[in-house]
UniProtKB/Swiss-Prot annotation:
Entry EC no(s): 4.-.-.-, 3.4.-.-
Protein name: Abasic site processing protein HMCES
Effect of C2A: Accumulation of uncleaved form with the N-terminal methionine
Modified residues (Phosphoserine): S160, S294, S321
Originating species: Mus musculus
Residues bearing the modification Thiazolidine linkage to a ring-opened DNA abasic site: C2
UniProt cross-link Glycyl lysine isopeptide (Lys-Gly) (interchain with G-Cter in SUMO2), position: K148, K151, K274, K275, K305, K339, K342
Length: 353
């Protein structure tokens, strides 16, 4: 299953991370709908709002079905046929949608038949592993392996500054397949909401949980899932299956409480360290990077700050783990990522909203 995610990037940075090629091969950025409803967070739970990619054709009849927009949607699909005046009165859970019953339940079958396919965006998602012999559960943060890419431009004068701006060379967002619907409230306002499709876990995650989100790995998979005008439902459903191209690390139990919204939620934790260590040099640099990517605001449950102004972490970079977490290229990427200073300054702009 998938019941908690992180999506902390400011709006303008998130937009750059979603750059894509249109049918003519031009590099483009998706446009926003209801941008003010987007709230970055390290700890998103059901019924909160998350950014979702979908085809522009859902809103503009003359649009190309391959064109994309981003819209914040409520997590937990509210069917269009729901009769109550309050969506919180929905009696069944629509946070996730099992791939094996997607064509059996009206809540999902109807919007899927209308082509209401979307891609849920996140840094990654959290999952909890039950510790043997205890009632405790260890949280993990799960995401795409991160590989540093070359920036565009080089010595090619034909590359405009606009195209360079549309090339993303940092954290790769997790792209999860979803279904959305539009419920019309008694007052006439439409509520857009979604459900994340889940599949059996891949081998690498099966020790943590038996289910995982249906992850769309690569631009082609994302394009086919979104383009309901060209790709039929049955063809699109072939994209829904477990993938192995993921990595993970344990994180602090601070993420257990959905009210906690700090960088510590996704910071790697050392399971062998019982004593709370102070932030080391690498973790401080990661904290500084994360701080530039999200709007600054005071959170009641934020950890206390030391003299340097940085929160004291109860975690540090993963050294050993009882599970075979994939490190390799991702570890190398993170090492280089942490050393970035001035290269990241252009991406540290605050959102316009």
């Amino acid at each position: 299953m998938c019941g908690r995610t992180s999506c902390h990037l400011p709006r303008e940075v998130l937009t750059r991370a979603c750059a894509y090629q249109d049918r003519q091969g031009r590099r483009r950025l998706p446009q926003w709908r209801d941008p003010d409803k987007y709230c970055p967070s390290y700890n998103k739970s059901p019924q909160s709002s998350s950014p979702v990619l979908l085809s522009r054709l859902h809103f503009e009849k003359d649009a190309d079905s391959s064109d994309r927009i981003i819209i914040p949607m409520r997590w937990g699909l509210v069917p269009s046929w729901f009769k109550e005046s309050d969506p919180s009165k929905l009696q069944f859970n629509t946070t996730n949608c099992r791939s094996d019953t997607i064509m059996e339940k009206q809540s999902f079958k109807v919007p899927l038949g209308k082509g209401r396919r979307c891609v849920v965006l996140a840094d990654g998602f959290y999952e909890w592993q039950r510790c043997q012999g205890t009632n405790q559960r260890q949280p993990y943060f799960i995401y795409f392996p991160q590989i540093k890419t070359e920036k565009s431009g080089g010595n090619d004068a034909s590359d405009s500054s606009d195209n360079k701006e549309k090339v993303w060379d940092n954290w790769r967002l997790l792209t999860m397949a979803g279904i959305f619907d539009c419920w019309e409230a008694p007052g006439g306002e439409c509520l857009y909401s979604y459900s994340i499709i889940t599949v059996d876990s891949c081998r690498g995650l099966s020790d943590i949980h038996s289910r995982m989100p249906a992850i769309l790995d690569g631009e082609e998979a994302v394009s086919k899932w979104l383009d309901f005008g060209e790709v039929a439902t049955q063809e699109a459903l072939k994209l829904i299956h477990p993938i192995d191209n993921i990595t993970f690390h344990p994180v602090s139990p601070v993420v257990n409480n959905s009210r906690n919204n700090t960088p510590e939620c996704l910071a790697p934790a050392d399971l062998l360290v019982k004593k709370e260590p102070k932030a080391n040099g690498s973790s401080q640099r990661m904290m500084q990077w994360l701080a530039t990517k999200s709007p600054k605001k005071e959170v009641p449950d934020s950890p206390k700050k030391d003299a340097s102004g940085l929160p004291q972490w109860s975690s540090q970079f993963l050294q050993k783990s009882p599970l075979p977490a994939k490190r390799g290229a991702t570890s190398s990427f993170l090492d280089r990522w942490l050393k970035q200073e001035k290269e990241d300054e252009p991406m540290a702009k605050k959102p316009n909203s």
